[in-house]
Amino acid sequence: MNKIYNSVRVSVPNWIDDDAFNDLLALLIDYKDCVQQIAFFSSDFHPPLPLRTAKTHFSILRDRIERAKEAGFSCGINVLSTIGHHPERMDEALSGPWRHMTNIDGEACEASFCPGDEAYQEEYVAPLYRMCCEAKPDFIWIDDDIRYGHIPIGNGCFCDGCIARFNKENHRHFSREALKTALEASENTQLRKTWLRHQSRKIADLLRVIRRTVNACDDGITLGLMTGERYFEGYDFPLWADALSDGGRYEILWRPGGGAYTDQPFLSQIEKAGQIGRQCAGLPENVTVVQSEIENFPYRLLQKSPRSTALEALLYVSAGCTGAAFNILPSAPYIENLDVMRGHFTAVRNVFPFEKLLSDLAGRTPTAGVYDGWHPHAQAAVSGSFLHDWGGSFAEHWNAVYTLGLPESFDFHTAAAYLLTGTAPRAYTEEELLKLLSAGVYMDAGALQTLNEMGYAELTGFSVGERFREDHLEVYTDHPLNRGFAGRARHCPQVFVKGESAALLPTDGAEPLSYLTDFHGKIAAGCAIGLYQNKLGGKICVSSHYAAADMGDPFKAAQMKRLFRLLSDDRLPFLPESCVRLRSFARQTPRGNAVILFNPNLDCLNDVAVLYAGNRSEIDYIGEDCNRQRLSAAGTDGKMTRFLLPPLPPFSMALLLPKEIA
């Protein structure tokens, strides 16, 4: 297969009618320079289609696919519903004797079916994909209904068959009620992990059925899977990729997704970049085509501007994708014609040379920098409801840290330093925790308390003392990390924004970096953030006062940047020296780190000083226009070299390359 960067996903109203399809093809032919692939949706509503309806759709799609291929596109089908999403137009939807997706209370979703129901797999899924193959697609995408969170029941599947299988495989005798009680008990982390593995295996079994079915028809058809952050599903992407690729024998596609349907505010796109980065990091290396989902649901023209739609593609390639899948087209009946989308596709064309540069350079290389603390078993570690809380909250807790410009890493084994919050440590194995505690870790009081309760107090250096509800000032101590602002203070107004605030109790050898006082100077806590080096050589920093919030003042920003240089043993690939709001991603290419910058401000960033890893005389700066500038060093700082960046316009991106890559 020639390298595919971008695809367009096409809804049924835009292909089922001859005139609508002709308009679609005319539009996309004009943008073949930036879109190489077309994926036709199998359905325009979210429960599974009856097989008779699917047969009609696929017979029409055979003609559409043939014509699109003749026009030079790679072309295939996006099966919207394999097990189903949620109730919609149920009079047209599939019905049958199979097990429905069911929550822990026994409530069923009539529009979705249990992925572990073998009768459903053989009597519906296999025939559906055989019909799909008859349309002669280059590829078949399996949509993101392959999950366990379905409207209106929430997380599944706890049907009688699933509980019986879990009991049999794990030598248990749970009733539904007893299983609910056991899973909701936060101390039952191992049971939760066992359930998550059970969840992942059911999905893998379904994917194997699809693989076998397609192979029996035409093993030249490439299969792809769309995902989101799949915490309640067990997040076992290596297992799913193995099932879909038949043990790595076949090339497969992947499409990480997750919300961000509007650009107001654009923060949701930045958060989605993190979600996508975590999904990419969980994929095996043999998955080489990874297209981000870019979705403007419900596909209103004003849902997202052309610029923000195109910018998403750049962000997600920076985080780990190799291209993008644009699901942005309004449906034919609701607009005069598709020409209204030319502005969006022109914006995609404008950034495509830079997108291609990033994709070709970074590919599937890992991210370098500060690890955000995500774990595939994060759902097992939630402190509240296992059935209703979301394991992704641990990673998204740290957005304020990354706004300082620290490069965000999603790869546990290649990170330079680590973040931990709350009960997240429960997700990790002992081996993983010892790796963390032997490296450099920044954590909050919740993570400290969790680690101490798990038996790691000897390695953390602190314990949690009195907790505070009233406002305090955090005063910086006379420590090298506070050079230039010792004695100054940070005020986090707890009366407005309730946050974590507590006293830290240091052990021998721990160094306070700040302490808390009232507004009259009386000390309330002798340590609020502290540093400790344990017997494994690990550098442990604990913050008990707004550890992941209110970092926008120059003193806290400077302290945090110096701190992570220390925690990482000066292995960070990049760091802004100026006090600016900036997002960065660093990709570990075979020839060195490539650093990708994003300006999330409404203002141009001017005269920004940055530190780049290594002692070097120059680096290359490449803007979105792909013009290359050679930057000369403006000094050194330890193991890093200082450079002054050219102006970086609002909501734009740039690439920094050392000369060994350039």
Each PLM stretch: what is its role?
Residues 36-39, 60-107, 139-147, 220-224:
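Glycine-rich, aromatic-flanked loop segments that form ligand/cofactor-binding clefts
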Residues 74-135, 152, 170-198, 208:
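Active-site-adjacent "subsite" loops/lids of carbohydrate-active enzymes
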Residues 2-16, 74-84, 141-145, 192-237, ...:
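Aromatic-lined carbohydrate-recognition surfaces of secreted/lumenal glycan-active proteins
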Residues 6-18, 43-58, 106-125, 187-205, ...:
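The substrate-binding groove and active-site-proximal loops of carbohydrate-active enzymes
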Residues 1-40, 73:
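N-terminal structural segment of carbohydrate-active enzymes
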Residues 393, 408, 412-413, 419-661:
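A conserved amphipathic helix/loop scaffold
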Residues 31, 36, 41-42, 88, ...:
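Hydrophobic targeting/anchoring helices
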Residues 14-31, 119-131, 237-244, 305-316:
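Short, acidic/polar
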